[in-house]
Amino acid sequence: MNKKFMGLSVFALATAFSYAQESDTLSVKNLQEVVVSDTKFAQSREKSGKVIEVITAKELDQKKGQSLANVLHQVAGVEINGNQSFGGKNLGYYIRGGRNRQTAIYIDGIPLTDASGINLEYDLRLISIDQIEKIEVMKGASSTLYGSGAATGVINITLKKSPKTTFNGSAYTTLGTQNTVATSRTKAQDINQGFKLNGSGHKVSYMTSLNSNDTKGMSEAAGDNFEEDSFSRVNVMQKFGFKPNENFSFEVFGTYDRIKNTFDNSFDGVVANSDDVNNANLSEQVRIGFLPKYTYKNGEFAINAGASTIGRKVQMTNTWANTIDNYNYTGRTVSMDAFNKYSFTSSLFIVLGTQYQYFDMIQKDPYAIVSNDQAKFNLIDPYATLVFNSELGLNLNLGARLNTHSEYGNQVVYNINPSYVFANLPLKVIASYSTAYITPSLYQLYGPYGNIALTPEENATAEFGFESQLLDKKLTINTVGFYRAEENTIGFFYDAATFESYYVTNIGRNTAKGLETTIRYHLSKQITFTGNYTLTQVDKILNRLIPKNKANLEVNYNFKRGNLAGQYQFVDQRIDTYYDANVWAKQTTNLSAYQLLNTTFSYELLPKRLQVFTAITNVMNESFQEVLGYNTRGRNYKLGVTFLF
């Protein structure tokens, strides 16, 4: 690649204004969206009393070239730390001031966890956004329906499905630069490519997809003359579906996901210590699933069953012993969620279900060997949700779950969620109070610092807000305030005198509160404005890498066969902490606020056959930090082409 690559990107954006004069055939987005996250069954968003952000297939298409982390980072109340860093940088999911352990991630109704992880958290880097059809982000404590970890929110991902045509497919290639603020290379060092084959007929559907990503050209750590790190990902997915009649259907799937990356050390006050040529990681995941569904006169019955294995091999430099140490982890998970919706009337239905989950892990490293004969537990959680949708405008969602854990016993969580739609006003008022739990991980129970006496963390969230549709439903505004409390968090104890260390349950209460506002305005059938603002205030102990203020603004111009989008983001200053090797103590620092501007242009050169897009990220080449001591991306260019057949 040479300077022609940059020129093509800029030229494509410039030509958008000439194409924009073509006649428009797109209609205003249907504001009566269907959501599934708050009941596990489809219902009108108007009848939902929860704060659910929906990212549709169309909106994902308008964000071509962005990663899953980039897309989620633009949602009100969601902070994905590391999304602007090098592609292999580990990610932090901070919803409403929470942490990774407090976010539940589901794909097609099946929970994703790494049973060998410190907090049972899942690595979002394993997921390719090119496999995704739709994302729902439901904020607030949601353990009643989603179990452990659903304390601050649920990221509910739906993968692409087979179309009704007998056969079709697509193939794509995307080339991008990989620059920091200090570099301006035009060489393509971020390469994405893949294909998809799918179709349906004679009651059978199928899908095969392969996606890959290779990134290099940046050091993960910030410093002069540091070696370049690398990141690669491969995703393979196979789906089969069968629908013998209108009432019964099922789907089976299998996936293989792999990431390989090199990484650097955390900042310790000495910049030269950050760069490390020996640190490397390999993560491999295999998932299988079975999803039957049966519809009858008064309801539906479904099972979401899946199993996964995640293996991680980590190589790190041991500066104390001057050796290279190897760490091997394997985590296995089995999940089966059987649930039934029964409608008593058109206004009243109940969801009854039971979720079973099994976890085990193996750990082999220089400090410990942990066998899955010991490191294992299971959960059996029956739950119920009652939903009442009155014709007078009152909606009520009541639910409860009994968490039964093989180690620590039982725990009850619940939710109360009323909402009211005014008949003569364009206004819906929502309120909720819900609780959640986070089970201790296998590592925290049985690892080298394990403590089998740990009890689950408890969370509770109270919300109050409204949604209004004005100007003939062209303008939608929703605002919600929240107050969140967490108790019995799991922490790490270290005795400097005896060098004894282990995990403990911290008795105490930490809180977070805030405000989230989202606005969508359809100026015309062609032009849409979307914006959001988030205010988050947390207790001092929680205040790391959490911006107090954050805002996003996006403008989309749709025209015949194309789309032009501009995105602006403001992220307030944040507090970061690090262990300073110079003074042997923890230090605190402030990271400055930053602003980003991105643009994307896409166009169908051949209708339903050939699409092209170009994107420029960090247009102003803003210098900023997400985490102290780590690089972030400067101005970069992407150019992509998709073939449809």
Regions found by a protein language model. Give the residues of each.
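Flexible loop and strand-edge segments within Gram-negative outer membrane beta-barrel domains
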Residues: 22, 215-237, 241-301, 305-333
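N-terminal periplasmic "start-of-domain" segments of outer-membrane beta-barrel proteins
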Residues: 33-63, 92
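Extracytoplasmic beta-strand/coil segments of soluble accessory domains associated
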Residues: 69, 73-111
